[in-house]
């Protein structure tokens, strides 16, 4: 069934004359909007009242940071030296090549800059952002599936998908959809449940759960996902670059949770609140 679905899909969502809009680009836009909506609704449920202008500024700043960070991390960690001899192609984001790990770092830095400008508490803003972020991750992974990229290893399971092209004619794990479900839907549900606990979890706790949860899921899914062709397996063939970058996330997430509990600072939106 998944195989039939894949072959019915087109990476191009809308094509009208010279205008072409891809599902991958739509995933970024809709993902950012959904994250903003979840942030707004969650902070209202917590009893806060961030202005729409401030929220919009934070989301825009974080998205810009995310795109820059995602691209730079891919160039540095996955490019295998290619971009040092083809520097202009660093800007060719339409050809793919984005790293979640870099997007996370860039998004955080972009968000922090805007928070300082508007005197927002970056810890609470980050917590609010990660409660909605799994929805964006889910859409992004679904777009990867539509594009026929980041596919998994060969499988004889009934939901295997023949991606064709460089993936060959053998059924493969739809690893993109595994991630869409686990780091998207499952992680979103976990964070939603935690966001409704009374009393509220302290600042940094949600960020810790998100980072650790993503790291665990990504590390495990990498076992059935084909590594980037230009890198293959690292450290003697035992680990992928994705796993190598995800292990620090698991550790950082755990440290954040412990730090949040020890610090035990209540959530607040504005620094002068």
Where are these regions (language model features)?
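A feature for loop-to-transmembrane-helix boundaries and adjacent hydrophobic helices
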Residues: 1-273
């Amino acid at each position: 069934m998944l195989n039939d679905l894949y072959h019915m899909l087109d990476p191009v969502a809308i094509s009208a004359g010279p205008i072409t809009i891809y599902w991958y680009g739509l995933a970024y836009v809709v993902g950012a909007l959904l994250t903003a909506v979840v942030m707004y609704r969650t902070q209202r449920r917590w009893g806060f009242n961030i202005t729409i202008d401030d929220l919009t500024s934070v989301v825009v700043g974080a998205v810009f940071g995310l795109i820059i960070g995602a691209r730079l991390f891919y160039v540095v960690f996955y490019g295998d030296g290619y971009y040092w001899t083809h520097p202009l192609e660093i800007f060719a984001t339409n050809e793919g090549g984005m790293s979640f790990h870099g997007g996370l770092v860039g998004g955080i830095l972009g968000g922090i800059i805007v928070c300082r400008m508007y005197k927002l508490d970056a810890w609470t803003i980050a917590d609010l952002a990660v409660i909605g972020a799994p929805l964006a991750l889910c859409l992004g992974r679904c777009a990867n599936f539509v594009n026929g990229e980041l596919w998994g290893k060969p499988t004889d399971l009934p939901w295997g998908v023949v991606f064709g092209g460089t993936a060959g004619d053998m059924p493969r794990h739809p690893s993109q959809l595994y991630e869409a479900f686990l780091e998207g839907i499952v992680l979103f549900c976990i964070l939603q449940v935690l966001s409704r606990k009374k009393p509220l979890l302290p600042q940094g706790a949600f960020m810790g759960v998100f980072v650790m949860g993503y790291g665990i899921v990504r590390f495990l899914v990498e076992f059935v996902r084909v590594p980037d062709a230009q890198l293959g397996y690292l450290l003697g063939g035992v680990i992928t670059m994705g796993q190598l970058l995800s292990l620090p996330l698991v550790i950082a997430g755990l440290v954040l949770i412990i730090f949040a509990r020890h610090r035990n600072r209540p959530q607040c939106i504005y620094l002068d609140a």
